[in-house]
Each structure stands twice: as C-alpha cells, then as structure tokens.
Curated annotation (Swiss-Prot):
It is found in: Cytoplasm. One of its GO terms (cellular component) is cornified envelope. The gene is Cnfn. It holds the Pfam family PLAC8. It comes from Mus musculus. This is Cornifelin. Keywords: Cytoplasm, Keratinization. InterPro entries: PLAC_motif_containing (IPR006461). PANTHER family: DUF614 FAMILY PROTEIN-RELATED. Part of the insoluble cornified cell envelope (CE) of stratified squamous epithelia. GO terms for biological process: keratinization. Directly or indirectly cross-linked to CE proteins loricin and involucrin (IVL). Belongs to the cornifelin family.
Amino acid sequence: MSYPVTSQPQCANTCYQTQLSDWHTGLTDCCNDMPVCLCGTFAPLCLACRISDDFGECCCAPYLPGGLHSLRTGMRERYHIQGSVGHDWAALTFCLPCALCQMARELKIRE
C-alpha cells in the first residue's frame, strides 16, 4: 500500500557564527618584542618575508603588488580577527613597520 506525501521535507538553515577577536597586541605595541621591533624598523622587507613564510605562503609574496595586504587580510580571516580590508590597507600604508611587527607578534602568539 502506498501513502500519499502530505508534506515536503524542509531545508535546515544552519548558521554558524564565529566569535571575532582582537589582535593580541596593539598596532603601537612594537616594543613588546624587541627583536621583532628592530627587524621591523631596520629591515621591514626581511620581516615581511619571514611573516609570509611563517604563515605558510611564498616568501616572495610581500614583493608582489598587494601581497602584504592580502597576507594581513588572510591572517585576520584565518584567526577570526576583527577588522576590514580598509583597516588593513590603512595600517600597512601609513604605519608599515608597526603593522608588520603586529603581524609577526600575532604569529608568534598563535603558533
């Protein structure tokens, strides 16, 4: 015997919300880690290459146009850090050494 279908299956809307966090250290907390601070001040491209390598990307990525911006945005996305592409752009454009030091410290803390 067959039974008629009286209701359609419903689609379950599962929504996952991830809790966004802040950077563990501030943009101007450069002196919290003196070796990183000195490297970011006097050899920022070397620090950028190290950050890229530690993050699992090609060490040449910082030399590509927009490479540092995508690296910082990728770091925010991977670690669920609050912010926006605009904030990333402003930090890297107006305060490159501080932004690089912040990224290096974040990787040290997270890894």
